[in-house]
Amino acid sequence: MAFRDSTRDFNRSRPEKRHASRSSSPRSFRPSNQNARANYNLPRVRDAMKEEERSRETKEMQEREFLRLQQLRRAIIRLKNDRSKPIDKLLVSVYLMPGPEWEENGEKNSIDFGTVDMFDPLSVIQSYKAEDLEEISRNIGDIQQLETNQCRLTYWKYVKMLVNSRMEHNKVGQFSRGLKVVAGEVQRILAPKSFEQLEQLEAQIQKKLKSNVPLDTDYWVDLLNSLKSYKAIAYLKKTFNEELQIRKNKLDNEEWDKAFSDAKKLSNMKDREEKLYIVPIDPKPILRAQAIPRRIQPEEQADYEKELNDHVNIVKSSTYIPISIPTQKQKPTLPKNSNLINEDEFSIANRARLEREYLQSDDAEEQEMLGDYVEGQTRVVNENGVTLKKPHYFNRVLLGFEWNSYNQAHFNEAHPPPKAVQGYRFNVFYPDLIGTGRAPTYRIERTRRKNKSDTTDLQDDVCIIRFIAGEPYQDIAFSIVDKDWDYSAKRDHGFKSSFDNGVLSLHFRFKKLHHRR
């Protein structure tokens, strides 16, 4: 039997290893298809990232513009409604400046300023107290973050500079140690200078402080700080005085025209006999002491006069003061019968008298009737388009415990039920009806028929009581509990219906339901 040489077969089966010669050149690297595609798409990715960045910046800019215009719109609304914040006048005034340098992309076309006019920024800042100045300084920081217009940014820079200067003045006094002696001289030198002259002087002082020349550093530093305040004042005068003077001249011409027109009307008017009201003098003012809020503190005469003089000086130094114009066009109203006392004074005098009566009666169950006036239930204009007057009123609601079957079952005298309405006292004022022989009336209006047999319902029905006087007054309506009235003439708490000296009085209580206990 023949055997093969296994070693030879093994060696023959092994693959022959080939070694590359050292002298042979290495292979050249060829990138894969994936790397080639990545290198090819890299410019596209960069362009997409740049486009995304531009889109993000555009959105942020649009958002800032939206928030900035919303700030302006809210300020205009508050000014129209006479509830403005300290920053509002400064904000609206800068947007009313004419010229393309103060406007971007026609933004003023989207803003309705209405009757809001420009204010003198210097007068506005001088009229505010320390706490108002602090609020203005905080608000300016928020505005500067949203602002993009360079002219308005410069404006806010100097407004904030002046506000901070006044705040510092209120804290440590107008001048520090170095300037107390020469305060008048500093004001005499800096006040007349223009904005450009103050800029030159500021540069000279800064150069002097940086030099090695011996000098009184405290004096020059304090002078530099004072110069910033005068520089801000000079900038605001330079920026606004021309436009404010134009508006002032226009207002002067309008007032002259109106004065001539009024004088012509007065010359054509005939003398008319005026009817005067007889208002009794308050005999016992001390009885109103309980109605005066305790938080009201007396003011010293000297402090009051100083504050008044400060306001007078601010008005005198103002270039232009806008006139407060109503936001809505005033409709014609009927003439009053008297020029001696108006509706408000008549109402105040009679409210004081009624308050004294209620204090003397010591009825703890009475409260002022609030929130029961029914809107939209009356005609406010007559056939000729003349606005009717809404009468003033002073109403009281009478409260007390009601021991019906439900309350007897769930409450006792130690733990009483909630107080329920037991009656009303209506006092409506009609001063123009004095001496006319006319008296107002009232009527009850129900939306559904009253069910007299239902005495167990826990929810009281309501109805409307309407007071009618005719022209020049509107009807006036109130929502009241619909229960049967007690017409008995009891002293103090009985039924009363009268019209005396221009006051309609309607006092009544509800009938009581008696239950055995």
Swiss-Prot record:
Similarity remark: Belongs to the CACTIN family.
The alphabetized list of GO BP terms reads:
alternative mRNA splicing, via spliceosome; mRNA cis splicing, via spliceosome
Which taxonomic lineage is given here?
Eukaryota, Fungi, Dikarya, Ascomycota, Taphrinomycotina
The annotated consequence of gene deletion is: Leads to abnormal splicing of introns featuring long spacing between the branchpoint and 3'-splice site. Sensitive to cold and thermal stress; simultaneous knockout of tls1 exacerbates the growth defect at both higher and lower temperature.
User: What is the purpose of this protein?
Assistant: Plays a role in pre-mRNA splicing by facilitating excision of introns featuring long spacing between the branchpoint and 3'-splice site (ss). Recruited to the spliceosome by sde2, which may enable folding of the RNA between the BP and 3'-ss to guide the splice site towards the spliceosome's catalytic center. Assists the splicing of several components involved in chromatin organization.
Among Pfam families, the record links this protein to: Cactin_mid (PF10312), CactinC_cactus (PF09732)
Q: What's the protein name?
A: Splicing factor cactin
Annotated Low complexity bias = 22-32
So which residues are the signal peptide here?
none
| Top-rank lineage group of the source organism | Eukaryota
Organism for this UniProt entry: Schizosaccharomyces pombe (strain 972 / ATCC 24843) (Fission yeast)
Identify the stretch(es) annotated as Disordered: 1-59
**How does this chain assemble?**
Interacts with sde2. Interacts with cdc5.
Basic and acidic residues bias locations: 1-14, 44-59
| One Gene Ontology CC term in the entry | cytoplasm
